[in-house]
From Swiss-Prot:
Keywords linked to the UniProt accession: Disulfide bond, Fimbrium, Membrane, Methylation, Transmembrane, Transmembrane helix
Cytoplasm is among the record's keywords: no
GO cellular component, one term: pilus
Name of the protein in question: Type IV major fimbrial protein FimA
Transmembrane segments: 8-28
Cystine pairings recorded for this chain: 57-67, 141-154
Additional remark text: The sequence shown is that of isolate 265.
Description of how the protein assembles with itself and partners: The pili are polar flexible filaments of about 5.4 nanometers diameter and 2.5 micrometers average length; they consist of only a single polypeptide chain arranged in a helical configuration of five subunits per turn in the assembled pilus.
Gene: fimA
Function summary: Major component of the type IV fimbriae that plays an essential role in twitching motility, natural transformation, and protease secretion.
Compartments it resides in: Fimbrium; Membrane
Length: 156
């Protein structure tokens, strides 16, 4: 009686495991970069929406606590230490937060500064993304995150 062999040999299984290991070694860092880039873009979008509220406050002449920004904090900013008061100071690095600095005059420089907290990717902890309004009423974005994570609209 002839016996039939079924299944894979040890060599075949080892080759499959090696291929999976190589693919994982390439894919995991790429995925981590993708996550960090998407988080920077998300914070840029979330904080960028506050520009309209700040413009409205400036046009209405409202100051500090009289100006309702109407923003729900982002879990990527981990709002510890952040504030939305007139001339707020920077949050504790690594803790994250949101600081909005604006003056009553529309000719002054106004800022929306977001600091990435502990819920963001490890490479983003303590990094900042800032929207700055010039006296000419134009907004620009700047950030200190690594170049490979910067969104197209925030390359400064």
């Amino acid at each position: 009686m002839k016996s039939l062999q079924k299944g894979f040999t040890l060599i075949e299984l080892m080759i499959v495991v090696a291929i999976i290991g190589i693919l994982a070694a390439i894919a995991i860092p790429q995925y981590q970069n993708y996550i960090a880039r998407s988080q920077v873009s998300r914070v840029m979008s979330e904080t960028g929406q506050m520009r309209t509220a700040i413009e409205t406050c400036l046009l209405d002449g409202k100051e500090g606590k009289d100006c309702f920004i109407g923003w729900t904090t982002s879990n990527l900013l981990a709002a510890a230490g952040g504030s939305t008061t007139n001339n707020a100071t920077a949050a504790d690095p690594g803790q994250g937060g949101l600081n909005i600095t604006y003056a009553l005059e529309s000719t002054a420089e106004n800022k929306i500064e977001a600091t990435f907290g502990q819920n963001a990717a490890a490479t983003l902890h303590g990094k900042k993304l800032t929207w700055t309004r010039s006296p000419e009423a134009t907004w620009s974005c700047s950030t200190d995150v690594d170049e490979k994570f910067k969104p197209t609209g925030c390359k400064k």
